[in-house]
Curated annotation (Swiss-Prot):
Cofactor: Mg(2+); Zn(2+)
Binding site for Zn(2+) 2: 821, 895, 902, 905
Binding-site positions, Zn(2+) 1: 60, 62, 75, 78
Enzyme class: transferase
Protein's gene: rpoC
Enzyme Commission number(s) of this protein: 2.7.7.6
Gene3D superfamilies assigned to the protein according to its UniProt record, in alphabetical order: 1.10.132.30, 1.10.150.390, 1.10.1790.20, 1.10.40.90, 2.40.40.20, 2.40.50.100, RNA polymerase II, clamp domain, RNA polymerase Rpb1, domain 3
Family statement drawn from the similarity comment of this UniProt entry: Belongs to the RNA polymerase beta' chain family.
The protein, known as: DNA-directed RNA polymerase subunit beta'
Pfam families with a match to the protein in the record: RNA_pol_Rpb1_1, RNA_pol_Rpb1_2, RNA_pol_Rpb1_3, RNA_pol_Rpb1_4, RNA_pol_Rpb1_5
Organism encoding this protein: Lactobacillus acidophilus (strain ATCC 700396 / NCK56 / N2 / NCFM)
Amino acid sequence: MIDVNKFESMQIGLASPNKIRSWSYGEVKKPETINYRTLKPEKDGLFDERIFGPTKDWSCACGKYKGVRYRGIVCDRCGVEVTSSKVRRERMGHIELAAPVTHIWYFKGIPSRMGLVLDISPRLLEEVIYFAAYIVIDPGDTDLEPKQLLTEAEYREQKAKYGNRFEAKMGAEAIRELLKKVDLDKEVKNLKKELQTATGQKRTRAIRRLDILDAFKNSGNKPEWMVMDAVPVIPPDLRPMVQLEGGRFATSDLNDLYRRVINRNNRLKRLLDLNAPNIIVQNEKRMLQEAVDALIDNGRRGRPVVGPGNRPLKSLSHMLKGKQGRFRQNLLGKRVDYSGRSVIDVSPKLKFYQCGVPRPMALELFKPFVMHELVKRGIASNIKNAKRKIDREDDDIWDVLEDVIKERPVLLNRAPTLHRLSIQAFEPVLVPGKSIRLHPLACEAYNADFDGDQMAIHVPLSDEAVAESRLLMLAAHHILAPKDGKPIVTPSQDVVLGNYWLTQAERGREGEGMIFSSPAEATVAYENGDIHYHTIIGMSADAMPKKPWPKGHEHGIFITTYGKLVFNQLFPDDYFYVNEPTEKNLNDPLDAKYFLNEGEDINSKINEVADDLIASPFKSSFLSDSIATIYKYYKVQRTSEYLDDLKELGYTSSTTSGITIGMNDVPEIGDKDEKVAKARKQVDVVSKQFRRGLITEQERHDRVISIWNACKDEIQNEIAQIHSPRNPISIMADSGARGNISNFTQLAGMRGLMATPNGGLFEIPVTSNFKEGLSVLELFMSTHGARKGMTDTALKTAQSGYLTRRLVDVAQDVIIRDDDCGTDRGITVSAIMEGDEMIEPLFDRLVGRFTAETVKDPETGEAIVGRDVMMDENMAHKICDAGVTHVKIRSILTCDTPHGVCRKCYGMNLATGEEVEVGEAVGTVAAQSIGEPGTQLTLRTFHNGGVAGAEDITQGLPRVQELFEARNPKGRATISEVDGVIDSIQENPAEHTREITVKGKIDTRSYSVPYTASVAVSEGDYVHRGDKLTLGSVDPKELIQVTDTLTTEKYILAEVQKAYRMQGVDIADKHVEVLTRQMLQKVRVLDPGETDILPGEVMDIGQFRDRNKEVIISGGIPATAQSIILSITKAALETNSFLSAASFQETTRVLTDASIRGKNDPLLGLKENVIIGKIIPAGTGMPIYRSMEPEADVKKPDSVYSIADIEKQMKEKDKTK
């Protein structure tokens, strides 16, 4: 086999008949497969051992030569070469055809390649190929035209008239002769000449023909190779035949298709030998043509060939296509050895970098390692005995297993793998039972729960794989989410509940006002029952000398609760004391108001600050902020410890708290019935107005809905006022552990209006709540909404998954390729607004980006941040506080790195908080970051209740798809094509339109917009090109024609951000930029100048510039082109890699086109390297990492730590507790 790591690129081309014969190890002459009695392959058949190699390793068919020592010998009795049976996966045969046949891909594809080369329409071509008409090949001196079609009757007539003075044939033979006659150079020359004058349809056809002929000319493929003399037979192990129980056989469909070809071919040979009448021969040739068509692409023309049960047979094309095809099933995703799967279960005792692996599973996964160790230790005498010991599960193997797994991490994966955090590495810990145990904080990243979810486990085998798992994939490293740089390991449920309860404050608890000299003293008091967690106490700052205290209070006494004191023990010793859940307290010392002034009584101080303490227990959102802050100051290791401690404390506290829910925790509302009766009266009034014809049906419906919503809100507000903050349900909702006020309303107030299946609302509300119980009708109405919720979720998951697939495909080859591309361009960013609503603040757009020019204070003119500096949070705050509204930053959109991005234009890697490394696969990360939250977006298109003007706006997932697929948006806005002033807005009642006139410096433009459209401008306003004249969504295709690429990219960026942020999903700009850039990578050539580019050709902007550079250097006229926007699907198919495009969609079309052009795949992206089995060119697969040599390092660096180090620290910590 060839070593895939040895070659640089991969080329595809058309195979000539001689090439097909050179691949072959012999001709398949008979349709037989295997002998029914001996079950051995038949001679000259489809499984012949002489052609394809032996079925048994190192043994010929007759058994004369057996064993490796005879390797390479060809048996003189049976003619089989003695070799490994693996060759039956790679050796090909061929069928020598009695008549040539055309290849259906090139004749039937759109556009028909054969038709374009010969300049014959596909319909006429079909008549010739399938023997319905003759075609004139050489008219001689007759008055016939070349390539003229003749029916059977016409042909006879002409034959009688002219005899042999002309030549006309039918079938593939005729096509081959015509293709041989095509003079490519001459045709190309003529077409280029024609293009100078041609217009309209003629020009389009000429460009298409020129494109194909030029491709043949440049690739070295010959047009006549589209017609085949010999058909290759693929290796037998790729179309196997296996015996089932009961003696029957199951076979691949390909064998049936090959048999049809061989049978028809043999019959045709016999007919030709017998000199059969022409009509019979022609019929047989047509049948042979159809058999080969079915073999190559069954069902492409006419009715497909069917097998038993009317099932269409799977042809060679079907073996490549779709999810079950070769590309996606076997090349991009393989089943792997050393893996298992099981149900997952929670284990709160694990450390953050550990997972529990069931003993039997671990034994099976690490079997070879255990066997090796058993032999090494002398417990077993050889490998066979070791295996036997393991199968018997002897007692002495478990200790060995414990030692074997110590330094070997395992990978855990949960499907669906939506982003890179769905596969993480853990240190295995042996556990009893059969379920895999997961750390509770790892659930968020996996989106896992324990209601029956399953996970797959994989063992990294090589030393490199183990090292990468430990250093790059260990769960303890994955604290921040790559999509927005915020912590993904946020505590939830019990942990949140426990810490919230722990940090609550209560007046009048036992021991209030006691002052302690140290936390240890307070703990003793708590254990003696003198104080409670919620007791407000005084604490000496001297007890925590390393903490930063406010100036002048370093030795003072501050007010806190014992619970908060316990919580603060989790933080590092030199971190601030946190008393209130604010960003200020996380980044600055404790507020001085909590400290006793000299001579002040503690009780008066408690009265002063008690309200602040009572109002500030630590909620879920604050815990998340605290994780981010600890990560910012102390990095991975300390954050990992903090998370584990937070989990421990949360579980302990929620157990101690004893919080439960009972029926009596749901409060009663006194005047609910009156409120409902009042609403009913209002509804009656509205119905009366409708009956009298004062309002329309739509208005009546809208008013009824708003009356009931108002009634529900009123009840909800009352519940919010009467429920006590110590109510267990309130504690759960307020802390963020589970539920919200709406759940409370449904339990205690009323359920309100229910959704109808078509997305509207029922007018009859559910006035009962769950405590009272629902009536039968109310329950029935509720079921519609519940069912709609379920179906919507299922649909959304599928939509979102497909979006992710397209995004990954278009961006997979975007990798950080160098340090700095040296560009002086950038984009100017400001806050994204929607009317008065802030969508994305400037601060979010600056953090982690490099400045493109110095940022100056708008008032003083002083430099705040220099040029080419990566802005961290502090710098971004400074810029925003100084009142700067626009900042020019380095951007992916303006990066000049070919086939990727440079570090400076990308900025910070959000998952680590550091500058991005060369080799980071930022394209895939961007696609995952946008696709993964797709399931959280709505599927709805909002309808505006019949208000004239404002169009229905598309939001959520459909809007994101609309943008990335560059579709014509719903409710399209009209945009101005010129810079100028709005001259007039006139109504045209006859046409039901308005006429908006824009007066520019050079010309004046008028736009006719519908009456219903909301006009966004007034007379006298100044508008720029691309500005909206009416409200709605701009069509990016229109925008790019009126403005430039950058404006279009910025528009798409802002719109995608709106769609996500309106649903409360934060995604960093850079991810959207990566994908937007991919959509605008291509240009369409308008005038080729003196280059060899064809007019109308779509090409990469980088290639276009390179070609122009060459022409300008040699003094020629450069080509001109226009930027175009491609949808992500189209962009993925237009990529330079045919392997990546073929494995995405439209496999046969991509391969047809690539082979005619003789395309060369440079193997730059990830997919194409995975397909051929080469190491991917990202991360440690980059050439700079591959060529590294290990060196002995004398000094141990501080930054790299091992699991053993952490364990040591944890043990020391446990001792001190």
